[in-house]
């Protein structure tokens, strides 16, 4: 009987922290759809090459525009 209670106690203690911690809804990782709607100006995009004035061909799929190809 004691071993069953011990197993139940361990299971409850392991599961409690996973369900008791409130999730922070303000994190960008929690809102991918909202993050994708934000329009980054081309000049400030991290894949924008200031010397060439355009993004590389590989950056087109990542959302950098204009693509010069």
From Swiss-Prot:
One of its GO terms (cellular component) is extracellular region. InterPro entries: Conotoxin. Keywords: Amidation, Disulfide bond, Hydroxylation, Ion channel impairing toxin, Neurotoxin, Secreted, Signal, Toxin, Voltage-gated sodium channel impairing toxin. It is found in: Secreted. The modification 4-hydroxyproline is found at residue 66. Expressed by the venom duct. GO terms for molecular function: ion channel inhibitor activity; sodium channel regulator activity; toxin activity. The cysteine framework is III (CC-C-C-CC). Classified in the M-2 branch, since 2 residues stand between the fourth and the fifth cysteine residues. Mu-conotoxins block voltage-gated sodium channels (Nav). This is Mu-onotoxin-like Am3.2. It comes from Conus amadis. The lineage of its organism: Eukaryota, Metazoa, Spiralia, Lophotrochozoa, Mollusca.
């Amino acid at each position: 009987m004691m071993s069953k209670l011990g197993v139940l106690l361990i299971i409850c203690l392991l599961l409690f922290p996973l369900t008791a911690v409130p999730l922070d809804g303000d994190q960008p990782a929690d809102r991918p759809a909202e993050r994708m709607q934000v329009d980054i100006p081309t000049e400030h995009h991290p894949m924008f090459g200031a010397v060439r004035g355009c993004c590389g061909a590989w950056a087109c799929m990542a959302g950098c525009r204009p693509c010069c190809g």
